[in-house]
Amino acid sequence: MMLSRDLRAEAAVRLWIMFLLLEDLLGACAVGDYQRRVPSAPNTDIRNTLEKPRVTTQEVAGPHTLRYDLMALSLKLPELPQVLIWRYFDDEPFLHYNESSNRTDSWEPRIKRHWRAMTWARETEDLQEMVEQLKRMLAEVTGQKGQDKGLHILQATLGCELQRNGSTRGFWHLGYDGRNLLTFDQKTLTWTMDMPFTQQKKTFWEPRAPRADLVKTFLDDTCPAQLQRHLASLRSEPLDTGSPMVIVTFRNYPLGRVTLTCRAFNLYPHMATRGTLAWLQDRKLVKQKAFEPGTILPSGDRTYQIWVSIWVLPGQEPQFTCNLSYHGGNIEKRAVIVNTVSGEKTRQPSTSGVGGRVKKSLWTTMTTAFMVTSWTRKTGGDSTLLLLWWLLFFSTVLAVLTLV
């Protein structure tokens, strides 16, 4: 059944009124959400607040790992050296040894600068001993009767880990042709087979493994000393990856609010544990988020990054500044919007914040009152007039909530 013209018009007006009411309701919720998430902060001396050092147990005690990966080939190939050694600190490569050139080199420039010639000679000598040990074992294995004279590969993974409580744990694994072979047990000081074996295989391999007393000395003394030496070199000289960077990004939401995100990159370990990233509004601390374990993210190059976000109202962005305070420096980045089309920096209109919301709420109420009053005069609808008074009441409540 078709509605009359008057009923259709009244239904359209009611739908339009409900749309305006819903729009105001969502806007008021957004403001309330903003006020809950970004509370006002007292007038605090920013230097005293941001420069308090925070030291984590991870910075002092670890865990940290020093690991060697060794590979020896039974045949000399023109494309590859017969023996290769890589050394890893916390699973990142930083030192390698090439038997063809008989030299040790580092992928980290600061290791080259910090270590003296005597240190390099000692490191090279230690690696050469590992090379000779690996080559002897491979020669004994391939020299046995019945062994295939083709290409064989002997691999070893060994090292130590510094625990959080200051204790160390060692490990030594051997592999042959890509399969796990033997593992050293530090408690019993014996080698155990890692794969299904017969007594003949056990008798063949275990006597040819490195001597237990030499392995124990390396895992208990040599490796922990090397790990501590490397940790000392890391603490004495900062990473050479450039200065920290601070980037501010924006994200607009349809409910009348903007998310400001501040990201800090290129943070050295001592910066990440003793620095603070915070938002300032008109030079006053708004929301502070200190660097804590669990919030620091590794970047993959031994530096770290962190971010902090707040919600603001459209037009308030120029009032906010992101502040990165760390030992040795201070970086500030203003929240200036970049026009993605022209690349020019712009600012939001000055009408914003609570005043803007109140203005919009009052405008909606007045417009609604005018339209519905005009319609009720033509139709004489008492029900529509009653709806008007309810809408005026709710709009007034929303305006008051916006001011709170």
Swiss-Prot record:
- The pro-peptide lies at 375-404
Task: Kindly give the Gene3D superfamilies that the UniProt entry links to this protein.
Answer: Immunoglobulins, MHC class I-like antigen recognition-like
The signal sequence is 1-30
Keyword line: Cell membrane, Disulfide bond, Glycoprotein, GPI-anchor, Lipoprotein, Membrane, Signal
- According to the record, the residues making up region (Alpha-2) are 151-242
Per the UniProt entry, the disulfide pairs are: C160-C223, C262-C322
| Glycosites | N98, N102, N165, N323
InterPro entries to which the protein is assigned, alphabetical: Ig-like_dom, Ig-like_dom_sf, Ig-like_fold, Ig_C1-set, MHC_class-I_related, MHC_I-like_Ag-recog, MHC_I-like_Ag-recog_sf, MHC_I/II-like_Ag-recog
The residues covered by the Ig-like C1-type domain are 224-338
Q: Where is this region: Connecting peptide?
A: 343-373
Query: What cellular-component terms does GO give this entry?
Result: cell surface; external side of plasma membrane; extracellular space; plasma membrane
Superkingdom as given in the UniProt entry: Eukaryota
Protein family (similarity comment): Belongs to the MHC class I family.
**Subunit info?**
Heterodimer with B2M.
Q: What is this protein called?
A: MHC class I-like protein MILL1
Q: Which source organism?
A: Rattus norvegicus
Taxonomy, top ranks, is: Eukaryota, Metazoa, Chordata, Craniata, Vertebrata
- Gene encoding the protein: Mill1
